[in-house]
């Protein structure tokens, strides 16, 4: 018996006895639970039952007296509730037989509650379906067999009432449905896809959104049969032509044309930077070769020699080619009424201009006129760069322009009154945005001799605010920064932006057109001419006043010369100025003689000249001596300060003495230990800190698993390495086996001994900690540098004393070459002495109270370095364990070059 979800479970009286008992038991159970609805579990489904007014038929006579009272209460409650009939729920699940039976799955029942139990509210999906059927969006025939013909009332405050959309803007009504009208008055949702019938009409049933939005030029030009044939031919073609990073050059185009003579298909393999944008390479190949790309996958392209028209030339205008090709396309392409976007088929976007099939006016006359004007302008600037990988128009090849233009000068500029020379932020941003979409005007590949490019840019600036220069890829020894500076210097323009691909120049607010510049230059030349004439007139007027007194001046000059000869022993000449009171003496000989007599000395005396030279030599020598003495005193002061700091650091350093009761080993054992130690992969690296507590701790940790330990020391000399080895032997208690020279420095092999016992304290207390060892290393380095500096100053001072003695020898005749050499050698500025402070003491105080818990890196047995320190140092004091031969930071103390040689095993 099929049970529909909208029917109520009311068994008829004509049933069998078994069914009657089932109904009686069912009614008694309903009376017992006082429920308005119930459900019976059947596997994973539940039967929903609703009770109407005829629920009174379910008798409860078999129950006890207590159950009869409960039945009366239940009937009274049932009369008050007056349950409404439930709605039909549209079940779109696969198991439709359960929905026909009124069965709802367990997971649905958990979400929707007792949908079939007679509740007044229905599911939201049912309301949506009813609304769609009401306005004709859903066909009612498919639900006709499943529906129950009964009246349905919209309950107040129901979900459907809340789901209702008012008839207003954005609403949903019959006059203005929430959709669009098709060609046959069919209402379509905006998001509704194309139907199967329309898909078949479009592209033989193979419709995709990608094909709908974008078609290749080959698909629109060739038929489907021809395209499939060409692709089959392409797959049988094995040979491929490589296109390198230079792109589609003229040589590549010629090679493709040559291959087309023997085959109609050419397969290409794109490599390098050109493979980063295959869509762009697709367009470039079609534009330059005149062929059609019939297949493209990854970096592989198949190019077809299309001979559909004689007007398809690879070197012609790209836009005009595409427009003519699009006009020859068949106009019988199917159209769809679904959406306006389906009717538009876009060609490949060339030069960022969409080309639409069926649109006759693809570009406005203004755009075509602008392109023709730019093309004509670039043709007048110079030869084109035919290997340009971008779009149309082709830029001018700046490398073919003359490098040097005779008589070239930067253009004349004049800033208008009240105009700022700099660009504002908004203006610069606007110009940069314009330059982003503009094609480049020039293609440049050299960094020098750019006068020809500057001349062409000035011509371009007559009609354009911006000049865009593209940098050729793959050109060696080119620097965009240098290019930009040279162009800016030659043209006077303003650099807007610079990157690895383009240079953008703004002509500037002071740029003048050719006519205006020539007019202003003529005016400026006229002003200069007038100024020159005025100056000459002034000079003529002043000379007219001086001419009458020329003879008097000549006589005065003779008189002064006579007096000068008479009074030559005297140092000063006191000429008479009474005769000059009535003369114009500015710039005359009399004025010069008067000034010489008052403030000048007689330099004609050779003795006076020699005396002055000797005085200069003495002053120069004394100055050099004082400078070196000051340097020497300052260096000695710093050295004393470094000695105090080093002594302060070494207060806690108490090195152990060499043991006299060492355990001896035979020569055979020493040889074997040396051989085994040099072959060990695990080693301990001794850094610039030298031997401190962490070094000894690592040695004991190493001896826990091995009898030998190999320590690498980068000392300058063998004596320094031996000094470090003896310190390691004394502090660790081991037996020194050997010190060998290897490619990485020196290898110190230490044997732990036959009666070795691990000490209770691995870190000895008489050595420095890690931080104090670093501070000590820095102070040693500073002291060593000061010692070398003092030695250099002393050497220079001795050299200076020898030179002073040489000056005494040439006292009668000055040696100018000697003092010039001294000036070059000692031309450094005088150093200012530093005040005595406690900066170093403050630095050293940071190492006073450090804990003893600083641990050094452990030893790694796989050959990796267990660094006790960052780098090696060999600067040690008298109580140090390293090499005291040099400092680790001065040029004289650089480490010996590592030698790639075999281990030298010493017997």
Curated annotation (Swiss-Prot):
Residue segments, region Disordered: 62-89, 101-123, 824-907
Molecular function in Gene Ontology: mRNA binding
Coiled coil: 621-654
Keyword rRNA-binding in annotation: no
Transit peptide endpoints, chain numbering: 1-59
UniProt feature, compositional bias: Acidic residues: 828-857, 868-881
GO BP: Group II intron splicing; mRNA processing; plastid rRNA transcription; RNA splicing; rRNA processing; seed development
Keywords: Chloroplast, Coiled coil, mRNA processing, mRNA splicing, Plastid, Repeat, Ribonucleoprotein, RNA-binding, Transit peptide
Subcellular location: Plastid, Chloroplast; Plastid
Residues spanning the membrane: none
Pfam families in the cross-refs: CRS1_YhbY (PF01985)
Sequence ranges assigned to domain CRM in this UniProt record: 220-316, 421-518, 663-763
Subunit structure as annotated in this protein's UniProt entry: Interacts with RNA. Part of large ribonucleo-protein particles that contain CAF1 and/or CAF2, and RNC1. Interacts with RFC3 in plastids.
PANTHER family from the UniProt entry: CRM-DOMAIN CONTAINING FACTOR CFM3B, CHLOROPLASTIC (PTHR31846:SF18), CRS1 / YHBY (CRM) DOMAIN-CONTAINING PROTEIN (PTHR31846)
Protein name: CRM-domain containing factor CFM3B, chloroplastic
Source species: Arabidopsis thaliana (Mouse-ear cress)
Phylogenetic classification of the source organism: Eukaryota, Viridiplantae, Streptophyta, Embryophyta, Tracheophyta
